[in-house]
Amino acid sequence: MSAIIDVYAREVLDSRGNPTVEVEVYTEEGGFGRALVPSGASTGEYEAVELRDGDKNRYLGKGVLKAVENVNEVIAPEIIGLEVTDQVAIDRALIELDGTENKGKLGANAILGVSLAVARAAADELGLPLYQYLGGFNAKTLPVPMMNILNGGAHADNNVDIQEFMIMPVGAESFREALRMGAEIFHSLKAVLKAKGYNTAVGDEGGFAPNLKSNEEALQTIIEAIEKAGYKPGEQVMLAMDVASSELYNKEDGKYHLEGEGVVKTSEEMVAWYEELVSKYPIISIEDGLDENDWEGHKLLTERLGHKVQLVGDDLFVTNTKKLAEGIEKGVGNSILIKVNQIGTLTETFDAIEMAKRAGYTAVVSHRSGETEDSTIADIAVATNAGQIKTGAPSRTDRVAKYNQLLRIEDELGHTAIYQGIRSFYNLKK
């Protein structure tokens, strides 16, 4: 094997026109890896810290020159000479070099860029696809896509409180078929919205963001779109929601303010509302149904719905093994959302997925609202046999890049490729 001989970072743009970090790693045997770092809109307070310059005269304060400098001047000298395939040692060196709990010194965006680029360089040098390098010969499960086709909340300027309404083509026989179903429903939804006189512009993640009258109208409209596309809701296609409740939670009164609905709810009332929605619609997954610090509320939600609905912790667990271990111990949730930039290194990401699986929790590999053409998360989903991926609508190249990579992987795996469909929800007791 060979050592790293050069590490170089630059400032580039993400899908929202904001700066982000791109890192390149070169090895002495000619291996090359490049990685771009994503960025979130609704972020959990326990996430690893993204370093931004704060200079209002450049990119409205969102520049990342400091993070780039940290890669080029602080990190590079430390990892040049290290064995490129020793991912765990390199990630440990990055964590120790930063020395903070939340990677706030060097920036999670600097650290993650290096961590991912190192893995790509190692795979390139070995002549292996990234998913195979990371997951070995047993990496063969294609994920069920969780496709965000209708947006509200922080991802849209409308009066829908729930941040994301998603479809999951669980009845497909292959990933290719699942993607086709999702794309057909997406186009069907556009036609349904147009016929109702709604705007069909798309939001950050490629989903539509019409000014619907209520959260339930969003669910009803998606059901109509699924049926008009020729599919059966509740059989071939299930619904999923990301409520992003921390955005609705008011710390002063400890209640949830659903401004679009014009109502204020307690934790108990939120749980009762979800129970009502689940009884009326084929909802199989709810993400961040309560505030990230409302552990009592999450426990109640898990007790009431955890046996039949996937309850995903995003802001709740922030891809962090300490937070996840606490959730497992308290019996909170039954699934974790995996975002590489919430924790900042590939090793820690894999640790979180492993911990989730051992506890019978599912792991949903996820994009961020500020994305790039980098498709690493597609490879991570297959490498870990996660079984689910959340990477937006089949619209906008930053989202489609991940889907296209999964199509390539499925082709490459041939007859050994597995698409689990509904069996991906091994956390449910149905």
UniProtKB/Swiss-Prot annotation:
Cofactor dependency: Mg(2+)
E.C. code: 4.2.1.11
Reactions performed catalytically: (2R)-2-phosphoglycerate = phosphoenolpyruvate + H2O
UniProt KW keywords: Cytoplasm, Glycolysis, Lyase, Magnesium, Metal-binding, Secreted
Positions with a binding annotation for Mg(2+): D242, E287, D314
Domain of life: Bacteria
Matches recorded under InterPro entries: Enolase (IPR000941), Enolase-like_C_sf (IPR036849), Enolase-like_N (IPR029017), Enolase_C (IPR020810), Enolase_CS (IPR020809), Enolase_N (IPR020811)
Gene Ontology CC annotation, any one: extracellular region
Cellular localization per UniProt: Cytoplasm; Secreted; Cell surface
Gene3D superfamilies reported in the protein's UniProt record: Enolase-like C-terminal domain, Enolase-like, N-terminal domain
Pathway assigned to this chain's UniProt record: Carbohydrate degradation; glycolysis; pyruvate from D-glyceraldehyde 3-phosphate: step 4/5
Residues the entry annotates as binding (2R)-2-phosphoglycerate: Q163, K339, R368, S369, K390
Keyword set includes Chloroplast: no
Active-site annotation: E205, K339
Cofactor remark from the record: Binds a second Mg(2+) ion via substrate during catalysis.
Gene Ontology molecular function terms on file: magnesium ion binding; phosphopyruvate hydratase activity
An example Gene Ontology biological process: glycolytic process
Principal subcellular localisation of the protein: cytoplasm
Function as written in the Swiss-Prot or TrEMBL entry: Catalyzes the reversible conversion of 2-phosphoglycerate (2-PG) into phosphoenolpyruvate (PEP). It is essential for the degradation of carbohydrates via glycolysis.
Membership in a protein family: Belongs to the enolase family.
UniProt-recorded name of the protein: Enolase
